[in-house]
């Protein structure tokens, strides 16, 4: 193989490795508004996030349930 061919292959592998590294570990966030009861309950929030999103984690914020999950 010639030198330019080796460099092109190396650069392609490098770019592909960087592209996959950027997409790993990205988190998305979604919010559920609480209508009843008036205050968010931690157990309900966690269960709803797991039901809606695989590996979702729920956190209560007054009248909202915040779900953080892998994109």
UniProtKB/Swiss-Prot annotation:
Task: Give the subcellular location.
Answer: Secreted
InterPro entries registered for this protein in UniProt: DEFL
* Primary location class: secreted
Cellular component per GO?
extracellular region
Annotated signal sequence range: 1-25
Q: Which Pfam families match?
A: SLR1-BP
Swiss-Prot/TrEMBL keywords: Antimicrobial, Disulfide bond, Fungicide, Plant defense, Secreted, Signal
Q: Name one GO biological process term.
A: killing of cells of another organism
Q: Which domain of life is it from?
A: Eukaryota
Q: Which cysteines are joined by disulfide bonds?
A: 28-71, 40-60, 45-65, 49-67
Q: Tell me which family the UniProt entry assigns to this protein.
A: Belongs to the DEFL family.
Name the chain's protein.
Defensin-like protein 124
